[in-house]
């Protein structure tokens, strides 16, 4: 195609030159000399184009070969490949990807790629401008009301109160996670079967007690504020999920090693690295970047801190003035509906800030410090046209764990036809975990998240499936997100202040689990 096109262009050029030579004009000699120069320049550009295409093709081939090598190396060496599926097994009622495993490759986070586009960076700058507006409005209101220009961080100081106690509590949680699962695995690999099973199970039981009971006891006994409780509960859930992944991935290879199949047990250094790297799927090795960009680490930590300040300003200016005295007014459906609609804007802001601060900034900072190559912690969930796609792309780190150890293992136990049951199991585990986190952080039980996630979210997952495409479905998904966040912020804020305005004269079980905002209207 190229040589023929080049000859055709050259013939047209020469034809044009010939016509110009025959034209009776005064500068005919000039046109005669310019035609060979034009032909030579065209030939030179064709040669340059061919050279550039050849170089690009070679570089692309090298990149693809390297990606294939890294993908092959990222497969766990201690596991045998899964047998091929029997003929006819890939039906509509069965799961074709039963043996699919997480493959780690070097790739950047999606927002880092989008930040290279000036148009998207402008949206980022708009959010920074919004933070500046909150700061200016806070200073202006304080100056008008009290005659001083001083930013107060009372809400931030209260939320992170007793943080050193939470960090001290983290130490035994970490040591338990570091030592108990690995030592149990070593016992199963080397000791006699009866003795190893008993000691290993005892170690894991002690590990579970430390992780489950210690943070709850510290939070209740010392009445930790919400942000300090967040540190404990997130680390508690993270350590439990990482411990399970390590044992789930390493135990099959360890049992085969006992039978003399020559499979080595996981190294302690790989397990230690796994406890800090931003993934919940254990592998002996991960793709690594060649060096650490410390300016990138500092930038992400600074952005995470900015998101925390942003959230404090949103709560202090848009939520506290509205809900602080709501429980002291008579209940009305109109006030409840208006409070939910008022909370949609701060609710969606909080959702975006949590996403950006944790899933992008925090995880990327730790990934960069540990040279962890695979930065796909999320995908383009904002473009989702179905809730099933939203749940898969919002938090890829947790989704990979649920898909590998709840959904796929559920299919292995129940059969490939039980896709619906396995999916309901994923929703149940995720909803209970989210409700437990909210209960731990806020200090009371109010199953708003459980109902929204398990009931409403489960229904929307089956109703708004992947076959729903088009802009209208994306608008509908965002509308449901706005309303859901408004319901959560409104109801949880009302319950928070109701429990402070109407304390129980005597603590009872039903008094602790019954929402106080339903009856506290003084």
UniProtKB/Swiss-Prot annotation:
Entry's localization field: Endoplasmic reticulum membrane
Keyword terms, alphabetized: Acyltransferase, Cholesterol metabolism, Endoplasmic reticulum, Lipid metabolism, Membrane, Oxidation, Steroid metabolism, Sterol metabolism, Thioester bond, Transferase, Transmembrane, Transmembrane helix, Ubl conjugation
Ubl conjugation found in the keyword field: yes
Tissue: Expression seems confined in hepatocytes and enterocytes.
Outcome recorded upon mutating residue 80 to R: In K-null mutant; does not affect ubiquitination and sterol-regulated stabilization
Per UniProt, location of the Glycyl cysteine thioester (Cys-Gly) (interchain with G-Cter in ubiquitin) cross-link in this chain: 277
Membrane topology of the entry: Multi-pass membrane protein
Binding site for cholesterol: 119
Motif (FYXDWWN motif): 377-383
The keyword Acyltransferase belongs to this UniProt entry's keyword annotation: yes
Subunit architecture: May form homo- or heterodimers. Interacts with INSIG1; the interaction is direct and promotes association with AMFR/gp78.
Protein family (similarity comment): Belongs to the membrane-bound acyltransferase family. Sterol o-acyltransferase subfamily.
Protein name as annotated: Sterol O-acyltransferase 2
Organism field: Homo sapiens
Record lineage: Eukaryota, Metazoa, Chordata, Craniata, Vertebrata
Originating gene: SOAT2
